[in-house]
Amino acid sequence: MRFRQLIEDVFMKHRVLVVGAARESTGGVTTVLNLCEKMPMWKKWQCYWLGTQLHGSYGRKAWYAFKAIFRAIFIIWKYDIVHFHTTPDKGGLLIQLPILIMAKIGRKKAIMHIHVGNQLNDNTENKFFIWWMQHCDVIVLLAKKWLNLLSQKYPQVKTPKVVVYNACE
């Protein structure tokens, strides 16, 4: 075993709470999370998928969100990193807000993974979205053009940004 790998395995063990759409949901975030779950990094980083959003009636959505937040109260403390898979819409961000607050109270690293870059143009006046970006430790985007757009449209957001081109590589 290489020395660097040994150091990484012993001293850099991280556990990641992955927050996003429910397994039972449909759409891009669920598709990405299903793919990530099959990758070696999922096991290496001891990831746990906490589904917060589900399609259906308002009652069903609210009940699902409540259960996820309640579950987070008990499990978030076991994780070092909380990785939010989200879009700029206020509804999804509002549902995930209590978990972000818990992460901040627990001094966890918070990653905001923005899945729908083409919505960046439509949310420049969305103060809640801007607030979210400013309170995360890293913002992940799926393409360099979204990184450029984010930097251009949201100059007030100083949070470090990275691009993940293809999580499968």
Predicted regions span which residues?
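A short, histidine- and acid-enriched strand-loop-helix "catalytic/donor-clamping" loop
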Residues: 87-91, 108-125, 138
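N-terminal subdomain of nucleotide-sugar transferases
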Residues: 2-54
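Short acidic/histidine-rich motifs immediately flanking catalytic phosphotransfer sites
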Residues: 77-81
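A short helix->loop->beta-strand "cap" motif at the edges of active sites that frequently abuts
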Residues: 106-109, 158-160
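Glycine-rich, highly charged phosphate/nucleotide-binding loops
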Residues: 61-74
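Donor nucleotide-sugar binding/catalytic pocket of nucleotide-sugar-dependent glycosyltransferases
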Residues: 134-169
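Membrane-proximal helix-turn-helix segments that form the acceptor-binding/catalytic region
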Residues: 70, 101-106, 122-138
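An aromatic- and histidine-rich active-site surface loop
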Residues: 82-106
